[in-house]
């Protein structure tokens, strides 16, 4: 069994073709038809970092401690979330894209991989927050390419 969990950042809930919009999203439309869609979800917070921590952990912001952007999720709490549970159950887990469980402009720097510039260690691939393999967009709002892209490409471009 394969589980592909897709989240997007700062978009309306009805912005995809499978939601009736005119935009063409054929691959996402096919996945939506064949899979499970969570169409009645409510975000636990107005900004993305606490919301992403809640998705990973299943906890509300006042429980996992990330109440605003710039507050890093404790890796021990993150590792106990769904990715860690799937990993312990024998699934191969991975994360590709912008995780935003921590930031380089955090109020309390923790030294997690997301707190480094993306060109410092482009070949690092985890483990992280319960995921065995990660390919992160580090500093999720980069406007410059990394100095040494891994395997010749990078998700920031």
Where are these regions (language model features)?
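Formylglycine-dependent sulfatase
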Residues: 1-157
């Amino acid at each position: 069994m394969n589980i592909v969990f897709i989240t997007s950042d700062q978009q309306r809930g009805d912005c995809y073709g499978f939601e009736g919009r005119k935009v063409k999203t054929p691959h996402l439309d096919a996945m939506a038809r064949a899979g499970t869609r969570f169409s009645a979800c409510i975000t636990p917070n107005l900004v993305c970092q606490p919301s992403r921590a809640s998705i990973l952990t299943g906890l509300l912001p006042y429980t996992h401690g990330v109440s605003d952007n710039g507050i890093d999720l404790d890796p021990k709490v993150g590792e106990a979330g769904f990715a860690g549970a799937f990993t312990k159950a024998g699934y191969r887990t991975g994360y590709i894209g912008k995780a935003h469980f921590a930031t380089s402009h955090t109020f309390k720097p923790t030294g997690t991989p997301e707190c480094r510039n993306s060109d410092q260690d482009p070949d690092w691939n985890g483990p992280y927050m319960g995921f065995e393999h990660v390919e992160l967009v580090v500093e999720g709002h980069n406007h410059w390419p990394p100095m040494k892209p891994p395997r010749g490409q990078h998700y920031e471009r």
